[in-house]
Curated annotation (Swiss-Prot):
The gene is tolB. GO terms for cellular component: periplasmic space. This is Tol-Pal system protein TolB. Part of the Tol-Pal system, which plays a role in outer membrane invagination during cell division and is important for maintaining outer membrane integrity. Belongs to the TolB family. Keywords: Cell cycle, Cell division, Periplasm, Signal. It holds the Pfam family TolB_N. It comes from Xanthomonas oryzae pv. oryzae (strain MAFF 311018). It comes from the Bacteria. It is found in: Periplasm.
Length: 439
């Protein structure tokens, strides 16, 4: 299969060969790139200071790993942590100045009773010797990783001014077996690959997962009925609804920012076009009508327009059309292949799969300063399906390595990349979920 057809693969099921894997395994992270210019921060081990059984989760390790993979921070290696304060009054700031640390995080874990734990932690500016943050959180043992991610989010936001996105989830598709024995699974996991959860299994391909804005549902494409169909599924209950099973292609679902509508690509009238479905009434509005192939819709953050991939100009490029329909405007002009757009929360950045020759990389168009500027985020050579983190600090994407599918997350400044892989298999179709809300 020629690579320029990959932008249509989700619709035509021209899938690359998939290798065997163990579906029950979670993703594991391997940091493959870093940045010497990242901000130094010491995350001190947080001991259990209570009676009874200590929690299995190493809170400080999770916090440190989160900060490291953001690309913005560089945690002090454990071997260089010469003192282990657990509260601010024990911090000798000169020690950490000598170690050239900008910030230090200290804390402790205590028994909160009835199977719960309390974590108290503080963040200090080392140069000033001042406390920047001091919080306490309580959770049951099975929620300690969630608490750790929330701590990392708070630290990240306090220092950078940008909301952290560690306490989020990702969706992806795995496959097992070969030939006619292939089995597929739509999975959801924490953003660091832990706590994988199977949403649906199928003997037929599963494609294009897309999160509802409240993070409670996934829209996806399934071929279990023979033809492509679009389902909505509740992640917590497993309840699902068939919303599109028209003749021909039913593909590339995308929730609107208010969660009330679904953009999708349909060929019910012959040619793949962009439609919007009202999820309450199931009424369809056709947005495009062109002899070219229009697919892969994704909403602008304000809900007023939709970006999509089209070859109407001869090669795949990104276009934009009003959510009510009308004429479409071309958005991308650099390169002769740009597809599968993901738009940042503020609408200023668009990540795409960009092709040049036989190499396909993840690139980003940034309009923050007005005129678009481009940067390359991945090395290639078969990279696709970019998906922004909700704070746009990182981009999740799919790649091929050694004949199998892997996922990478790269910081939006391309300073750090992390590989997320299954130990023995194939993983594709990534989608980064929205912010989560504590209950």
């Amino acid at each position: 299969m020629k690579k320029p057809l990959r932008w249509l693969a989700a619709l035509t099921v021209l899938l690359l060969p998939l290798s065997a894997l163990a579906q029950q395994q979670g993703l594991t992270i391997d940091i493959v790139g870093g940045s010497a210019s990242a901000t130094p921060i010491a995350v001190i081990p947080m001991p259990y200071q209570g009676s009874g059984t200590a929690p299995q989760t190493d809170v400080s390790a999770v916090v440190g790993a989160d900060l490291d993979r953001s690309g913005q921070f560089r945690t002090l290696p454990a071997a260089q942590i010469v003192e282990k304060p657990t509260r601010g009054t024990e911090v000798q700031f000169q020690t950490w100045r000598t170690l050239k640390q900008n910030y230090i995080v200290v804390g402790r874990v205590m028994n909160a009773g009835e199977g719960a734990y309390r974590v108290e932690y503080e963040l200090f500016d080392v140069a000033k010797g001042e406390r920047m943050l001091g919080l306490a959180m309580t959770a049951r043992a099975n929620a300690m990783r969630d608490v750790s991610h929330q701590m990392a989010d708070a630290i990240y936001e306090k220092i950078t001014g940008v909301r952290g996105a560690f306490w989020t989830r990702i969706a992806y598709v795995t496959a097992s077996g070969k030939g006619g024995a292939m089995r597929y699974a739509l999975m959801v996991a924490d953003s660091d690959g832990y706590n994988p959860q199977t949403i649906v299994r199928s003997a037929e391909p599963l494609l294009s997962p897309n999160w509802s804005p409240d993070g409670k549902k996934l829209a996806y494409v399934s071929f279990e009925r023979g033809n492509s169909s679009i389902y909505l599924q509740d992640i917590a209950t497993g309840a699902r609804e068939l919303v599109s099973s028209f003749r021909g292609i039913n593909g590339a679902p995308s929730f609107s920012p208010d969660g009330r509508r679904l953009a999708l690509a349909l060929s019910r009238s012959g040619n793949p076009e962009i439609y919007v479905m009202d999820l309450g009434s199931k009424q369809l509005t056709q947005l495009t009508n062109h002899f070219g192939i229009d697919t892969e819709p994704t909403w602008a953050p304000d809900g007023g327009s939709i970006y999509f991939t089209s070859d109407r100009g001869g090669r795949p490029q990104i276009y934009q059309v009003a959510a009510s329909g009308g004429s479409a405007n071309r958005v991308t002009f650099q390169g002769n292949y740009n597809a599968t757009a993901s738009v940042s929360f503020d609408g200023k950045k668009i990540a795409v799969a960009q092709g040049s020759g036989n190499t396909y990389r993840i690139a980003m168009m940034d309009r923050s300063l007005g005129s678009p500027s481009w940067s390359t985020l991945s090395p290639g050579s078969l990279d696709e399906s970019p998906s922004f983190a909700p704070n746009a600090s990182m981009v999740l994407y799919a790649a091929r390595e050694g004949g199998r599918g892997v996922l990478y997350a790269v910081s939006s400044d391309a300073r750090v990349r992390q590989r997320l892989v299954l130990a023995d298999g194939d993983v594709r179709e990534p989608a980064w979920g929205p912010y989560r809300t504590a209950h």
